[in-house]
Amino acid sequence: MDIQTILEKTLPGLGYELVDFELTAQGTLRVFIDKEGGITVEDCATVSNHLSRVFMVEDIDYKNLEISSPGLDRPLKKAADFVRFAGQNAKIKTRLPIDGQKNFIGKIEGCENDTVTVSFDGKTVQIELGNIDKARLRPEFKF
């Protein structure tokens, strides 16, 4: 099995969502997890201990394993992410331009039929999930 398959099969059973992962050229495997209510240090330790054992059994080659929350500016990858974070601001970069524009910063209005609706500058744009290159939440800080 590959790393993604192992993570997708293992993490939900532990009560966590796989947000993203990366394997660096130096051999560091970073796994970003989330759950309702957020991630604690204990959650990271639990997942790290469990995955270390699973990766040993599956003979996955890595040097260091890092488990982390996705942070306030978490990536948005799946339709469920855009549904969950409707009403929040995001920065979205598309693969192909929409009306001559590839970068959008605005409020996520929702996601239906694999199409994300975003409002910005008094306009609304619909972006197909397949056209999204990168998307991240843009947290607002009010002082």
From Swiss-Prot:
List the Gene3D superfamilies: Ribosome maturation factor RimP, C-terminal domain, RimP-like superfamily, N-terminal
Alphabetically sorted, this entry's keywords are:
Cytoplasm, Ribosome biogenesis
As for what it does, the entry says: Required for maturation of 30S ribosomal subunits.
Q: Which organism is it from?
A: Neisseria meningitidis serogroup C / serotype 2a (strain ATCC 700532 / DSM 15464 / FAM18)
The cross-references to Pfam families, in alphabetical order and at most eight, read:
DUF150_C, RimP_N
Its primary localisation, in coarse terms, equals cytoplasm
Q: Which gene encodes it?
A: rimP
Swiss-Prot/TrEMBL GO biological process terms: ribosomal small subunit assembly; translation
Q: Which family does it belong to?
A: Belongs to the RimP family.
Please tell me one Gene Ontology term that the record gives under cellular component. Answer: cytosol
Q: What is this protein called?
A: Ribosome maturation factor RimP
Q: Can you tell which superkingdom this protein's organism belongs to? A: Bacteria
Classification lineage: Bacteria, Pseudomonadati, Pseudomonadota, Betaproteobacteria, Neisseriales
Record localization: Cytoplasm
**Matching InterPro entries, A to Z?**
Ribosome_maturation_RimP, RimP_C, RimP_C_sf, RimP_N, RimP_N_sf
